[in-house]
């Protein structure tokens, strides 16, 4: 790990540009908090810019995060062990996000931003899928306009109204970092996916850039809420 001294590399998170990752992450977290996605310090966000990874800290109320709370990693960097990760800025008295290796898994696949939320709708659809399809089932929905907000895959354009969206679901673990292997396996099994649900936990969503990751996260949450209501009304998620 890099030798980080007090105050070293603070310039990496100091900018008047609202589009700078150190300013965007607090803004995103405040937005997500207003949706109820990152309550109780849960969830997080990370942005890749050039060879730097900017990551929200662990254990800080997401609506209160400030630029000086942001961690910065050199990229590429090892996912494991944590001691091998190359932090070039590490705020005093704060811990790195437990989501870090999962964010890195998304960046290794070309993402520019990765978001983790504890959305209640995401949690509920994982339970409904488990009850209806068993633990190996994935979330599927079709013939809903908002599906157009989700990419078909890298360089394949956006999904259409008649397409069936599929989001893999992995089982939760006692510790966040232990989800990494299952997340990567889901990415391999569903190479075109931009999201992975975690049963009884939430969702990881990534995109080519911040705007795409944010709008895809919003579109998915809309679809999950709609799916829960459709199920309550006895309506199928996939139109035959």
UniProtKB/Swiss-Prot annotation:
Subcellular location, record wording: Cytoplasm
Cofactor: Zn(2+)
EC code: 4.2.1.109
GO terms for cellular component: cytoplasm
Reactions catalysed according to its record: 5-(methylsulfanyl)-D-ribulose 1-phosphate = 5-methylsulfanyl-2,3-dioxopentyl phosphate + H2O
Superkingdom to which the source organism belongs: Eukaryota
Keywords, alphabetical: Amino-acid biosynthesis, Cytoplasm, Lyase, Metal-binding, Methionine biosynthesis, Zinc
Binding site for Zn(2+): 116, 118, 201
GO MF term set: methylthioribulose 1-phosphate dehydratase activity; zinc ion binding
Record's cofactor remark: Binds 1 zinc ion per subunit.
Residues annotated for substrate binding in this entry: 99
Major subcellular location class: cytoplasm
Gene3D superfamilies: Class II aldolase/adducin N-terminal domain
Pfam families, per database record: Aldolase_II (PF00596)
Active-site feature positions: 145
InterPro entries assigned to the protein according to its UniProt record, in alphabetical order: Aldolase_II/adducin_N, Aldolase_II/adducin_N_sf, MethylthioRu-1-P_deHdtase_MtnB, Salvage_MtnB_euk
One GO process term, biological-process aspect: L-methionine salvage from methylthioadenosine
Pathway where it operates: Amino-acid biosynthesis; L-methionine biosynthesis via salvage pathway; L-methionine from S-methyl-5-thio-alpha-D-ribose 1-phosphate: step 2/6
Top EC category: lyase
Function in brief: Catalyzes the dehydration of methylthioribulose-1-phosphate (MTRu-1-P) into 2,3-diketo-5-methylthiopentyl-1-phosphate (DK-MTP-1-P).
Record-stated family: Belongs to the aldolase class II family. MtnB subfamily.
HAMAP family named among the record's database cross-references: Salvage_MtnB_euk
Protein known as: Methylthioribulose-1-phosphate dehydratase
Organism of origin: Paracoccidioides lutzii (strain ATCC MYA-826 / Pb01)
Name of the encoding gene: MDE1
């Amino acid at each position: 790990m890099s030798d980080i001294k007090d105050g070293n590399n603070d310039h990496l998170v100091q900018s008047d540009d609202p589009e700078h990752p150190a300013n965007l992450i607090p803004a995103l977290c405040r937005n997500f908090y207003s949706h109820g996605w990152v309550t109780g310090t849960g969830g997080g966000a990370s942005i890749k810019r050039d060879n730097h990874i900017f990551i929200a800290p662990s254990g800080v109320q997401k609506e209160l995060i400030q630029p000086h709370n942001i961690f910065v990693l050199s990229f590429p960097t090892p996912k494991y062990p944590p001691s091998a990760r190359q932090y070039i800025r590490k705020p005093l008295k704060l811990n790195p996000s437990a989501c870090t290796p999962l964010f890195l898994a998304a960046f290794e696949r070309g993402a520019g931003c990765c978001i983790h939320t504890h959305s209640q709708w995401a949690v509920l659809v994982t339970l409904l899928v488990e009850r209806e399809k068993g633990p190996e089932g994935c979330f599927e929905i079709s013939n809903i306009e908002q599906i157009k907000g989700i990419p078909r895959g890298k360089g394949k354009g956006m999904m259409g109204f008649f397409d069936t969206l599929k989001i893999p679901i992995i089982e939760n673990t006692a510790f966040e970092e232990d989800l990494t292997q299952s997340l990567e396996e889901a990415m391999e099994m569903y190479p075109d996916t931009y999201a992975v649900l975690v049963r009884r936990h939430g969702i990881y969503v990534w995109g080519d850039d911040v705007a795409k990751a944010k709008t895809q996260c919003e579109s998915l949450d809309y679809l999950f809420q709609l799916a829960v209501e459709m199920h309550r009304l006895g309506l199928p998620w996939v139109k035959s």
